[in-house]
């Protein structure tokens, strides 16, 4: 079985396991599917030939590829996450394989009229000639991050079967609940024992990322007073309208649909409720730490304004920081970025260095003493029914993992 065949076989099998995390759950991991998947990976890591394969009570899977050199090489790690996003259903994923893709529109689901088009997704024709894997139009695919996870598995298998490629000790980890910001919450950096690591959790070919958002989540509860609408004058307080009023205070242009590059935003992720009570969940993002703090203060000030207007119980705010920009922790060990950059160039891949408009486990791990930049995996349109992945790009990602390991040994 060549690399491409192994990638397809593993990936299509892995995405069929429902591993969506759950923001509302307080268990670790938050869903049983992640435990099921972790147990499967433990067995497969052992089958490949890795050692020190463990899965702890919190669902964190770790394993070791022993060094095959006498050189004193720093221990490096490769990480991916077990869970998939909560934005769209991940149950009963039916991956569709399109070999030698012609670059044109793909009808994902004729019955539901779900069509992946170049008009909506202009990057699509660039994958002409590739083998791509799509959804059937009813679920997300789960390439985020089962593409990265698959690539690590295939790369480790490749290194074991090609002992002429010299490398130091490599540690592998698969983490739960990344999509809800809890990935590193119970990650044992000391037990992992790597000097630094890479998350395989990026997007298109060439992605190399070591700047991430500063991130916070804000949960707002709006409490109203419900009465019969016929006699509601001066009595009713509509909680849903309070939520609408709060949102109206936020700058319209500071939203994901209007921002790019280094621009931050407020994002209304969900709004549920009725006259009596409504709940809104926002995420707050900015690359600049001062701007990040200013955004959080803006939310607090809006809440205060509304409390003064309607009463303290009318709006209740719970806000917490989720992760910070990893750049601060990557810069002192810039060589780990340089080696990844050189590895890509040597494989005729043009590195695309850009800020992550999101977060990875590496965002938090970098602040826990494990500097962790992010590398591409080949996926596009994450978290929805139009998600797809290029197997050709996945193969390139495997080659990058192998080349990074080789270069660390060579330069030791």
Swiss-Prot record:
Classification via InterPro entries: ArgE/DapE_CS (IPR001261), Bact_exopeptidase_dim_dom (IPR036264), Peptidase_M20 (IPR002933), Peptidase_M20_dimer (IPR011650), Peptidase_M20B (IPR010161)
Cofactor: binding comment: Binds 2 Zn(2+) ions per subunit.
4Fe-4S as UniProt keyword: no
Enzyme class: hydrolase
One MF term in the entry's GO annotations: metallopeptidase activity
Biological process terms in GO annotation: peptide catabolic process; proteolysis
Binding site for Zn(2+) 2: 144, 179, 383
Gene Ontology, cellular component aspect: cytosol
Chief subcellular location: cytoplasm
SUPFAM superfamilies (UniProt xref): Bacterial exopeptidase dimerisation domain, Zn-dependent exopeptidases
Cofactor(s) recorded in Swiss-Prot or TrEMBL: Zn(2+)
Entry keyword set: Aminopeptidase, Cytoplasm, Hydrolase, Metal-binding, Metalloprotease, Protease, Zinc
Active-site residues from the entry: 83, 178
EC numbers on record: 3.4.11.4
Reactions catalysed according to its record: Release of the N-terminal residue from a tripeptide
Disulfide bonds: none
Known role: Cleaves the N-terminal amino acid of tripeptides.
Name the UniProt record assigns to this protein: Peptidase T
């Amino acid at each position: 079985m060549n690399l491409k065949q192994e990638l397809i076989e593993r990936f299509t099998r892995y995405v069929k396991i429902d591993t969506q995390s759950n923001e509302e759950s307080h268990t670790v991991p938050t869903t049983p599917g992640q435990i099921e998947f972790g147990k499967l990976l433990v067995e497969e890591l052992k089958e490949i030939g890795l050692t020190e394969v463990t899965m702890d009570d919190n669902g964190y899977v770790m394993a070791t590829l022993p060094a095959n050199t006498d050189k004193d090489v720093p221990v490096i790690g490769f990480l991916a996450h077990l869970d998939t996003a909560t934005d769209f259903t991940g149950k009963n994923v039916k991956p569709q394989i399109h070999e030698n893709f012609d670059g044109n529109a793909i009808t994902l689901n004729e019955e539901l009229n779900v069509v992946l088009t170049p008009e909506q997704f202009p990057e699509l024709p660039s994958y002409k000639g590739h083998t791509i894997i799509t959804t059937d139009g009813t679920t997300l695919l789960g390439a985020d991050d089962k593409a990265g996870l698959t690539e690590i598995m295939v790369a480790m298998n490749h290194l074991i079967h090609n002992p002429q490629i010299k490398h130091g000790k490599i540690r592998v980890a698969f983490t739960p609940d990344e999509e809800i910001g809890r990935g590193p919450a119970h990650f044992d950096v000391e037990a992992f024992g790597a000097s630094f690591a890479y998350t395989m959790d990026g997007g298109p070919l060439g992605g190399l990322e070591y700047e991430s958002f500063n991130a916070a989540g804000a949960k707002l509860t709006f409490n109203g007073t419900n009465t019969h609408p016929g006699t509601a004058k001066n009595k009713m307080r509509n909680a849903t309208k309070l939520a609408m009023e709060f949102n109206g205070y936020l700058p319209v242009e500071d939203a994901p649909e209007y921002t790019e590059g280094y621009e931050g935003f407020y994002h209304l992720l969900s709004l549920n409720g009725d006259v009596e009570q409504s709940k809104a969940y926002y995420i707050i993002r900015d690359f600049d730490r001062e701007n990040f703090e200013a955004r959080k203060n803006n939310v607090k000030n809006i809440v205060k304004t509304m409390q003064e207007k309607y009463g303290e119980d009318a709006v209740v705010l719970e806000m917490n920081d989720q992760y910070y920009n990893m750049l601060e922790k990557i810069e002192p060990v810039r060589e780990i970025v340089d080696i990844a950059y050189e590895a890509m160039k040597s494989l005729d891949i043009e590195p695309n260095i850009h800020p992550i408009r999101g977060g990875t486990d590496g965002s938090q791990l970098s602040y826990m003493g494990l500097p962790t930049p992010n590398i591409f995996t080949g996926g596009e349109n994450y978290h929805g029914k139009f998600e797809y992945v290029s197997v050709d790009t996945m193969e390139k990602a495997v080659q990058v993992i192998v080349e990074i390991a080789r270069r660390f040994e060579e330069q030791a």
